[in-house]
Design a protein with these regions (language model features):
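Fe(II)/2-oxoglutarate oxygenase catalytic core
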Residues: 1-118, 122-132, 148-151, 199-220
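Short glycine-rich loop/turn motifs
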Residues: 116, 138-141
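Short Gly/Pro-enriched loop/turn and capping motifs at secondary-structure junctions
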Residues: 150, 175-177, 194-198
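Conserved metal-binding segment of the jelly-roll/cupin
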Residues: 161-175
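A short hydrophobic beta-strand segment most commonly corresponding to one strand
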Residues: 140-144, 169, 184-199
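Glycine-rich phosphate/pyrophosphate-binding beta-alpha loops
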Residues: 135
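A short beta-strand-loop-beta hairpin characteristic of the jelly-roll/cupin
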Residues: 145-164
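Short beta-strand His + acidic residue motifs that chelate non-heme Fe in jelly-roll/DSBH
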Residues: 128-131, 152-153, 170, 176-182
Length: 220
């Protein structure tokens, strides 16, 4: 399972399926906030559940690799605090502490592309088919908030069981899939951050390149 991003490939980035948490010192504060983040999620579910829509949908302005069963799939839905860099103030209003915590993290910031910060809901008995993400210059982070038994994630050849309050980061340019084999919903907080190996200059160059490509495509 090589790195196979479908938008941008950064050479010479180490191959890691799951990134060691010890290199991401903010993970500890993220896990410590599990209770308050779950409370805000429950507020969102009670007050604005309609914000959950299919994670991959027909009107999405991006290329999705191996989209197959992912497209317009009601069993995998999401409610965004930020989607492709754009804030959703209705969702944010339910989740002020989540917003505050996210703003303290090294989120990937690329105009029109990132960050994306969302609550990701996987229905009972559902699976997310194998797929790859856009960039290998970022990591996708999960904080499980409402997790029944029998939920898991595979990245490359590595599998992990999803457990409430146990966060991780992984390279989503590597083929990955998820499942919920229980009879309850699974909801996690999902967001993207820069890989720690990249310095500020490299991040700026990647940002400038991808913003320029997006601007060109929008004009043609």
């Amino acid at each position: 399972y090589p790195q196979m991003p479908h938008v941008f490939y950064m050479p010479d980035i180490p191959y890691r399926t799951f990134y060691p948490n010890e290199y991401l010192p903010w993970m500890k504060s993220l896990e410590e906030a599990t209770d308050i983040l779950q409370q805000e999620l429950q507020t969102l579910l009670a007050q604005n559940a309609k914000r959950f829509t299919p994670y991959v949908h027909s009107g999405l302005d991006r290329t999705v690799s191996d989209e197959g069963d992912l497209l317009d799939n009601e069993s995998w839905t999401s409610a965004y605090l930020w989607q492709n860099g754009a804030p959703d103030t209705d969702v944010m209003a339910c989740c002020p502490e989540t917003v505050k915590l996210m703003e303290s993290l090294p989120l990937t910031k690329i105009n029109g592309l990132a960050p994306s910060v969302l609550f990701s809901k996987l229905s009972a008995g559902a699976t997310i088919a194998p797929h790859t993400g856009m960039l290998n210059a970022r990591l996708i982070c999960h904080l499980p908030l409402m997790v029944p038994p029998e939920c898991g994630l595979r990245v490359g050849q590595d599998e992990r069981q999803v457990k409430r309050g146990e966060s991780w980061a992984f390279d989503d340019s590597i083929n990955h899939e998820a499942w919920n084999r229980s009879d309850e919903e699974r909801i996690i907080l999902l967001f993207d951050v820069w890989r720690p190996e990249l310095n500020e200059e490299e991040r700026h160059l990647i940002t400038t390149l991808l913003e320029s490509v997006r601007s060109y495509r929008s004009a043609t």
